[in-house]
Amino acid sequence: MRILNCFHTIADLDLLSEDDWISGSSSGYIDTCYLKQILNCYDESALELSCRVREASISSDISCECTAVTVSDQKTKSFLERMAALGFTGTDLIQLDDASPTENLSSERTAGLLYSYIKKQTAFDFILCGLQSGDGAQGKVPFLLAEYLGIRCISNVTGISPAGDGSLSVISQRDAEICTETVHGPSLLIIGNIANTFLRVPTLRQRMQSRGQKITLYHEAELASSFPEELNPATTGTVRLTNIEPVLQQRDSEIFEETDASKAAGVLFDYYKKWI
């Protein structure tokens, strides 16, 4: 069984200063190049699920090979090295010619590059993608990729486990029900919100053992040259960022200076009476 994880890293926007948000609101561009990169939360869950599936497969004498790929720039090499230490036998980087933040909005471009990359590989049984990224937040890439490849797509997946015979037991959340089914490849699984799926940290021994594993680099121009005309981002349209602003987290508050508990309770009661 061959599993491919398509993951994405994002800038840690919690570290962005208020002044940078204000300046970006007017220009439509926020410089995040100096911010630390972190794993997109949905992709992190997908990567951890792959690790768990591989472990369960090994204990059941089932062959399972995991590959990780990302569409980004050289900043993500440390993440791919981490994947290698965690047992991913393939660690591939699709390097963008222009990795500006606005390009994160081009879902067609990302899906097209992943499509061309997958067509150059030995066939995968399952492709795992996160629900959406924390920067573009469009949620289009997994659906576009499944459509381009012509394979089944299951959204809002909350659990997977090996079911034998190269298949997976997949749990997915629907509007009014939780569905559990045995899925055969090729299929694309969109990983949703799952609790307690932080990606594990490799040990020093694991890092030392994976030092010799090379990261395979694919250039955008190389993959874009094999785009079918109907998948060419230049002909499918793009999204242009026109404005960006932070969500205000401030709340109005009043301070009552009362040291006696009963008096403080009375003040609060009088205050809340006007809302009842």
Model-derived features with residue positions:
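Electrostatically charged, flexible surface regions
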Residues: 17, 157-276
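Short, glycine-rich nucleotide/cofactor-binding loops
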Residues: 30-46
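Histidine-anchored nucleotide/phosphate-binding helix
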Residues: 43-58
